[in-house]
């Protein structure tokens, strides 16, 4: 299976561990465990969380090194997981259920969100399109087939009874192609939505956070092999990731959180504030996954045409409960 390489990959050993390692024999330093983490696109909350955990040296506190890969969509990230090029990825929970039917043995191990906070179907501000039904036979941007943007595009078609052409462009291609007129609309996620709204370059046709019924919309995912062979590394990885999230959500860290989000996403502070207040603070603090949430996620997937799915019970494990690193 061919893996499309990410535009950015960093092997990061957090500073506290690095400093401590200077006093250790070279052979001991060479044995540090590396965990390969994949996220679906750059300007997206799992990237913010993972980068924050790295910058706060939380992986080092757990005794591991994090190698972060930013892919060009959820489908590419899942392909990497299937090929053994990633240990842990963030993706839509239903991707696990679909993958199981294709022989990709993996599980959702920790939930991230119960809604598409900050996700919208948008058009340019000066677009003549005022209603979703006016997108009939038009071009609508998504990151990749099978991604969260694809699921929401298909949901919009089913819910509003309209058909349009879904155009996969990767996370970095959505905004430029919308603004250039190559797209009539696009499914977009925060903080890109907030930036475009504040800049008055786009307006919303659908607020998916309000329109779509609540269900498990995101999860950290690991292969069965990684779960079985390296459970403590997986536990440590989740501890660090949720430590990063809790750091961002803590009101005492608000100024630093806004600064981190602005730096990581390369956005102005006012847009970083919108991302923090309207999205990050709403994310799951404990990584819980309940069967009812997973069932609803699969119902959502079936609604948009994903029919060959493993059961909810087969698609997740509750064996790992994040203990946020501080």
Residues of each region from the PLM?
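N-terminal export signals
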Residues: 10-30
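Conserved C-terminal helix/tail region of periplasmic/extracytoplasmic solute-binding proteins
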Residues: 298-326
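Short, solvent-exposed loop/beta-turn-alpha elements that line the ligand-binding surface or hinge
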Residues: 57, 61, 210-212, 281-290
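Pocket-lining segment of extracytoplasmic ligand-binding domains
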Residues: 94, 172-261
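Structured segments of extracytoplasmic/periplasmic soluble domains
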Residues: 56, 62, 80, 84, ...
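Short, glycine-/small- and polar/acidic-enriched structural segments
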Residues: 31-160, 165-169, 173-177, 184-188, ...
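Secretory targeting signals
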Residues: 1-6
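Secondary-structure end/capping motifs
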Residues: 228-307
């Amino acid at each position: 299976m061919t893996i499309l390489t990410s535009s950015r990959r960093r092997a990061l050993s957090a500073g506290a561990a690095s400093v401590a390692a200077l006093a250790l024999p070279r052979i001991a330093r060479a044995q540090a465990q590396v965990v390969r983490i994949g996220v679906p696109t750059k300007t997206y909350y799992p990237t913010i969380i993972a980068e924050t955990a790295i910058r706060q040296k939380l992986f080092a506190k757990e005794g591991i090194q994090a190698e972060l890969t930013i892919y060009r969509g959820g489908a590419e990230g899942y392909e990497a997981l299937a090929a053994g090029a990633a240990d842990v990825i963030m993706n839509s929970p239903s991707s696990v259920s679909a993958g199981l039917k294709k022989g990709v043995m993996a599980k959702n191990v920790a939930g991230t969100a119960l809604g598409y906070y900050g996700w919208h179907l948008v058009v340019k501000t000066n677009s003549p399109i005022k209603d979703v039904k006016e997108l009939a036979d038009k071009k609508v941007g998504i990151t990749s087939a099978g991604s969260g943007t694809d699921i929401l595009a298909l949901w919009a078609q089913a819910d509003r009874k309209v058909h349009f052409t879904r155009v996969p462009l990767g996370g970095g291609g959505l905004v430029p192609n919308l603004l250039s007129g190559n797209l009539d609309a696009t499914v977009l996620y925060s903080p890109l939505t907030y930036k475009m709204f504040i800049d008055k370059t786009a307006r919303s046709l659908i607020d998916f956070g309000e329109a779509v019924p609540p269900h498990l919309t995101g999860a950290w995912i690991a292969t069965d092999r990684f779960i079985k062979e390296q459970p403590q590394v997986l536990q440590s990885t989740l501890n660090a990731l949720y430590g990063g999230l809790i750091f961002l959500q803590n009101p005492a860290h608000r100024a630093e959180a806004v600064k981190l989000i602005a730096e990581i996403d390369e956005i102005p502070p006012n847009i970083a504030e919108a991302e923090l207040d309207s999205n990050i603070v709403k994310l799951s603090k404990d990584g819980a996954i309940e069967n009812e949430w997973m069932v609803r996620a699969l119902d959502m997937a079936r609604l948009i045409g994903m029919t060959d799915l493993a059961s909810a019970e087969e698609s997740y494990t509750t064996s790992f409960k994040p203990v946020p690193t501080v």
